[in-house]
A protein has these predicted regions:
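Thiotemplate assembly-line natural product biosynthesis machinery
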Residues: 1-20, 71-83
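Residue-level recognition of oxygen-bearing side chains
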Residues: 6, 26, 68
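Phosphopantetheine carrier-protein modules
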Residues: 12-32, 50-59, 83
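Catalytic nucleophile serine of serine hydrolases
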Residues: 35
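Conserved catalytic core of two-component sensor histidine kinases
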Residues: 39
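AMP-binding/adenylate-forming catalytic domain of the ANL superfamily
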Residues: 56-68
Length: 83
């Protein structure tokens, strides 16, 4: 599975929905995420991609869509490799 597929699988699992969201769709507006699910999802992302997303970065806009989540994960993966 590529990065986007892994992220999508996490979002679907956390949301308990049966369908996958469109990569640009608002996960909050579509009911995939709320503030409680966001923290669970971030924890899953950190485990899956072996990254650490600081609490100060937990702005819902960073996690608005699959595409935005992919950008955020890539940012922290690049930072982990640079260390």
């Amino acid at each position: 599975m590529n990065k986007r597929e892994r992220i999508t699988a996490i979002v679907v699992r956390i949301s308990n929905k049966r369908t996958e969201p469109d990569p640009e769709e608002s996960l909050f507006d579509a009911g995939y995420l709320d503030s409680f699910a966001l923290t669970d999802m971030v924890s899953e992302l950190e485990k899956e991609f072996q990254i650490r997303i600081p609490d100060s970065e937990l702005n819902p806009r960073r996690f608005e869509s699959i595409a935005r989540i992919e950008e955020t994960v890539a940012k922290y993966m690049a930072g982990a490799h640079a260390a």
